[in-house]
Amino acid sequence: MATVNQLVRKPRKSKVEKSDSVALQGCPQRRGVCTRVYTTTPKKPNSALRKVCRVRLTNGYEVSSYIGGEGHNLQEHSVVLIRGGRVKDLPGVRYHTVRGTLDTAGVQDRKQRRSKYGAKRPK
């Protein structure tokens, strides 16, 4: 335990909280251009072909971003919006692409949880 005198000379340091999404630099989303669109396999025990794209952001960072939902229209040079949120079974993928904005189309025939996938309300 520190004495009062020691605390007067050198106060206690407060802990600095580390961000999970460094490339966003405190912003809710960031815009970027796809440099590569590809599929990758998840960690054990899962098995799939997860859709991922490499994105060069407007602030100069280059990050991997997961493309959620069934089917997508992204290719190289597509302009996308990314948000934070990692994919637990894909190492190094710490961002999600936002569906239904910029060049990313929403998911077709989506009936539930539509706002997450940029789908309009069905007639």
Curated annotation (Swiss-Prot):
Keywords: Methylation, Ribonucleoprotein, Ribosomal protein, RNA-binding, rRNA-binding, tRNA-binding. Residues 111-123 have a biased composition (Basic residues). It holds the Pfam family Ribosom_S12_S23. One of its GO terms (cellular component) is small ribosomal subunit. One of its GO terms (biological process) is translation. The modification 3-methylthioaspartic acid is found at residue 89. HAMAP family: Ribosomal_uS12_B. This is Small ribosomal subunit protein uS12. It comes from Alcanivorax borkumensis (strain ATCC 700651 / DSM 11573 / NCIMB 13689 / SK2).
